[in-house]
């Protein structure tokens, strides 16, 4: 049986892994487009749920699942939550996102 692990990455960890290395980023993008062209990527439209507030629908969260095949073979989902109220409140982020692979 394969042991499962959870690894939480902070922004610093992602940067250290090469996020700001444009050669590495472009190589990953090129590979992604190649796999997409071969039909190896499943990327359905996002599902959006609006959250009502006292005045109108100004907040929402989205789920964006995807699967990358080929030699990568990994599935994941991005959850994104946006709040107009947060955007008008100093000191807190407009949106909070999480990617699960």
Where would I find each of the regions flagged by the language model?
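N-terminal ligand-binding/catalytic initiation module
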Residues: 1-101
């Amino acid at each position: 049986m394969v042991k499962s692990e959870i690894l939480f990455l902070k922004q610093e960890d992602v940067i250290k892994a090469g996020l700001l290395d444009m050669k590495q980023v472009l190589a990953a993008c090129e590979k992604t487009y190649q796999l997409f062209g071969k039909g190896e990527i499943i990327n359905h439209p996002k599902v959006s749920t609006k959250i009502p507030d006292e005045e109108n629908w100004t907040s929402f969260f989205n789920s964006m699942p995807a699967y990358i095949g080929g030699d990568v073979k990994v599935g994941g989902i991005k959850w994104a939550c946006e709040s107009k109220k947060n955007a008008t409140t100093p000191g807190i982020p407009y949106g909070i996102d999480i990617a699960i692979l």
